[in-house]
Amino acid sequence: MRWKRGQSSGNTIDARGSRMPGGGRVAVPGGLGLVGVLVFLAVQLLGGGSGYAVPSAFDDGTQAPGGGAIPADQDPERDLRDFSEYVFDSAQRSWTRTFGGYRDAKLYLYRGAVSTGCGNASSAVGPFYCPADQRVYLDLSFFGDMEQQLGAPGDFAWAYVIAHEVGHHVQNLRGTNDDVRRLQREDPGQANPLSVRLELQADCYAGVWAHSVFDQLDDGDVAEAIRASEAVGDDRLQRRATGEVRPDSFTHGSSAQRAKWFRTGQASGEPADCDTFSVDDV
């Protein structure tokens, strides 16, 4: 993806130089994540976006202090940090044009562990969005995990990750998150299928943003994003972790579903085409 550093929107909080109080003890967040809780995959806690936080004595929802930015000339992740901010700002500008009620989220960069409005989390959960504080949480080390562990390298694969989380913010502003949580409470048996539809819509919204920056893309960029969406499919992650696949436990969608809905948004650029809740078969 072709990009250049420009004026920051001021929506990035860089706390990579801070430490979370309490030594970084971890609870599963009640936020909405790209891949769910990777470290707990074997016990089927794939649902960073399931809406059900795991009780914990440390899950008090307190906020970690801001600040802790690393000086640019001492930052080995500077290029990735600046690219992440660029993509985040680009996605938000796109949604401001598309969605009249859009209000900016914040991008919160951290290392290792973080305390959020949705509870405490470690970088093992992957990138996630917290509706309670309207922040996207990102540990830049996940970029290396995508390449080395998930087989999804490339700058536009990373851009897809960020755009997916911004998509969750759009859902929050539109009331989609609240609607899904209400339906999950009313019919717990549908909690996972509803979560899948929510995540696939965020994938489609990421595609809508990709459509808006088509003139900045290099050959192979869209393919990178599609590979990334496939790499974080529930079926592929479950097979890697346990050697078996249980579709009834999916919370984010299969590799094929995630790639399909990203392509849908990327092809049309129309958010209206991302209504994953009105179709019988996602």
Label the predicted regions.
Residues 1-70:
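Long amphipathic alpha-helical segments used for membrane anchoring, targeting, substrate engagement
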Residues 53-57, 113-139:
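Catalytic zinc-binding patch centered on the HExxH motif and its immediate surroundings
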Residues 76-78, 82-102, 107, 193, ...:
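Short helix/loop segments within enzyme catalytic domains
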Residues 83, 102-104, 123-125, 131-135, ...:
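Extracytoplasmic
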Residues 142-160, 190-196:
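Short pre-active-site segment immediately N-terminal to the catalytic Zn-binding motif
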Residues 166-181, 213-214:
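Catalytic Zn2+-binding segment of zinc metalloproteases
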Residues 233-282:
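Pan-zinc metallopeptidase signature
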Residues 95, 138, 156, 160-173, ...:
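Active-site recognition of the HExxH zinc-binding catalytic motif
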